[in-house]
């Protein structure tokens, strides 16, 4: 909205041209989202349900009694700030609407004693992921660019929708599984969104740089980058209160929308393999456990039998890592690995 307003007010007062700058709006949106989340969380978390702990989770008793479901506070902040700083585009409005639905699903799980069943959550996640995939492609073929090879691939609708649905479902649940240590899911996600935002804004949203690196240029890349940085701001405000020892937990109302948005942004980049680059630690920590359960439950195939998942539970119980050690080491791994993998992704083609 501010972007449109900048054009209307430019003739009245010259400095209003700042509202036409995507970089200014990204910075303003990030700071505003962080400030509003930081301010509103402690004023509303007394109304949130209390955490009841998780069966078999390491250190679950440390979280019991704390307010859970903070996503129901910071996700609306994300939506409102995004509406303020995004260019007017129907597809972005559709994305924000579905993210609110994902938040509501998570909040229902947070509020219900014992939560929703795994199958209920899985089916709802699948339906919402399908909706996200349809929003991305608009029932049109989608151009995909890949690592190593320079040629682009045009995916037909019948191929893109199931593949995109699977990726969004995976990121939604992997991020949810990572939410088990104070600050971990929020910090890893914030790092991922910062890298994603940088790629979407500075490379894929820039005609000169994208041409130099032989990757597609997306005119709406700056809009997707804005979503990424605004969510980063919300996570910064949340992490202020979630730093160990935490005062509030994001719950499914936060982790599921975060994972959903992450999958959407990766697909908006045109390269689904980017998920391994910006969210590798989240996938290893959470998604490998999902794979282990899936193979064992449906095919009676046991893998990683000596490894406890999510991986953060394994290193705490088997390696004796403290919660701060898990947080710092996992985040450092993501910070160091992502630039190296980005270099490979964009230069080895």
Question: Which residue stretches match the model-derived regions?
Answer:
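Membrane-proximal soluble regions of multi-pass membrane proteins
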Residues: 50-53, 71, 280-329
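Final/C-terminal transmembrane alpha-helix of multipass membrane proteins
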Residues: 324-345
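Short beta-alpha connecting loops at secondary-structure transitions
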Residues: 220-221, 275, 296-300, 349
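"…together with the soluble PPM/PP2C metallo-phosphatase catalytic core" -> "…together
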Residues: 2-284
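Short flexible/disordered coil segments
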Residues: 115-119, 294, 346-347
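Hydrophobic transmembrane alpha-helices of multi-pass small-molecule transporters
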Residues: 193-197, 289, 338
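A short, structure-level motif marking secondary-structure boundaries and short turns
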Residues: 28-30, 156-157, 296-298, 340-342, ...
